[in-house]
């Protein structure tokens, strides 16, 4: 599997955010295994254990911008039971949260606030873009709306829809868990320029393209 290595770029222009650079690399654990089977296997077990704890205890930041936030809140009700994924502990402060969901229309006036809240999240942190407005500006192709939060934030999972269903949020949460389970982060207590290795996950539209082509009878909304 290919990975994307992300490091801080001190030479990046001030206008660009975040200040980082990325490149495609191979699995770092596979490279370490060639140096020593014992240490390579031990590092793999440690990475899997840490990732297991992180992905099964994702605390979301209680933050919403527009109508998609209503659908996100619906996922926390008893019919959907988001507690199954360890994400029922909603935090009122970004310093206590693991990830934030941009649910709604990112206006230009709101962009600095969103960016500041993202910076207050402690590492490791992740971002889910929920809804057409957060993904690409939606139908608001106007001067006051940012055409996608990925213009100023690194996004891990995109949720399409206007607005998305609560089930779509749960699926995005599971996709984020799968991605976290394959991440390679430094385990040292020394902060340095080790970088973060994120797996290159395939897009769901590409993965399900063959299944959609085979469809001859459309399902009703109750069957989806």
Curated annotation (Swiss-Prot):
Cofactor (UniProt): [4Fe-4S] cluster
EC number: 7.1.1.-
SUPFAM superfamilies attached to this UniProt entry: HydA/Nqo6-like
Main localization category: membrane
Keywords annotated in UniProt: 4Fe-4S, Cell inner membrane, Cell membrane, Iron, Iron-sulfur, Membrane, Metal-binding, NAD, Quinone, Translocase, Transport, Ubiquinone
PROSITE patterns per record: COMPLEX1_20K
Region of interest (Disordered), ranges: 200-224
One Pfam family recorded for the sequence: Oxidored_q6
Coiled coil (UniProt feature): none
Catalytic reaction annotation: a quinone + NADH + 5 H(+)(in) = a quinol + NAD(+) + 4 H(+)(out)
GO MF assignments: 4 iron, 4 sulfur cluster binding; iron ion binding; NADH dehydrogenase (ubiquinone) activity; NADH:ubiquinone reductase (non-electrogenic) activity; quinone binding
Function (record text): NDH-1 shuttles electrons from NADH, via FMN and iron-sulfur (Fe-S) centers, to quinones in the respiratory chain. The immediate electron acceptor for the enzyme in this species is believed to be ubiquinone. Couples the redox reaction to proton translocation (for every two electrons transferred, four hydrogen ions are translocated across the cytoplasmic membrane), and thus conserves the redox energy in a proton gradient.
Quaternary state and interactors: NDH-1 is composed of 14 different subunits. Subunits NuoB, C, D, E, F, and G constitute the peripheral sector of the complex.
Family: Belongs to the complex I 20 kDa subunit family.
Stated name of the protein: NADH-quinone oxidoreductase subunit B
Organism: Aeromonas salmonicida (strain A449)
